[in-house]
Amino acid sequence: MLHTLRSLWVWFAVALLIVLWLPLLTAIRVTDRSPVRYRTGRWFRNLGVIMCRANPFWKIHLSGHTRVTDPRKPYVVISNHQSLADIPILSHLPWEMKWVAKKVLFRLPFVGWMMRLAGDIPVDRADPHSGGTMLLTAMRYLEGKCSVMFFPEGTRSPDSRVHRFADGAFHIAIKAQVPLLPVAIEGSYRCLPKRSWRFGEPSSVHVTVLPEVPTKGMTVDDVGRLKTTIRRMIIEEVARARHTTVDAVDGLSTVSPSAVSS
């Protein structure tokens, strides 16, 4: 009962923050002259950070290459995807990046409106033209020295393991000749379990920024190898943080999901 009441309280606080943040973000957008809406985007990510701080269930730990010397150096950022909580959690990273997200999210009241204000990138898998539009928008941001963020699994992991990566993000990085920045997130699947509105037990989430991987000189022929390299880096880091084996984290391995420790 106490756990349910705490979850209700956190959702109330989150809803209040979202409603209050919309007019603030609208005012910032009106005065933001940057073609990539950098300041608007950063203020939107700040909402995610505040939401995490308002939640007594979550403790966020950042490690790795988080100290960037140039926040305007463009990357294609790649992360595994364990939970809806990943979005506010990854907003702790100290640079602006535009998120590639399902088009349906942009239709949500308040949150979807703010995603549009911040300049995030919608993609509709049912529309064959949507991928091309997404690519052009992502390229424009990268040319404007703003990073772009992808969950290449395309959806939340059903079992907390790292599943198959799509090619799109890697094509974009090679086309733009910008480095890839792998990010491994571990523990968020406990924060907000799939198909549940209640927050999980108090959880520590570890976000590790791994070394960048250059794409200079690569061509489309390198997409498969590059994708395998990045996915392997993330799997190895998740396995290290979880104190388990690589096979237990790899969603394409023959190891049963039940072997994944919680």
Residue ranges and their predicted role:
Residues 4-5, 132-262:
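Non-catalytic C-terminal accessory region of glycerolipid acyltransferases
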Residues 25-42, 53-55, 70-128:
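Catalytic core of membrane glycerolipid acyltransferases/transacylases, capturing the structured
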Residues 52-53, 115, 141, 173:
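A generic structural signal for well-ordered alpha-helical segments
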Residues 64, 79-80, 101-102, 151-153, ...:
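A secondary-structure boundary/capping signal
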Residues 57-59, 96, 117, 145, ...:
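A generic structural signal for alpha->beta connector loops
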Residues 1-75, 254, 259:
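Membrane-anchoring hydrophobic helices of lipid-metabolizing enzymes
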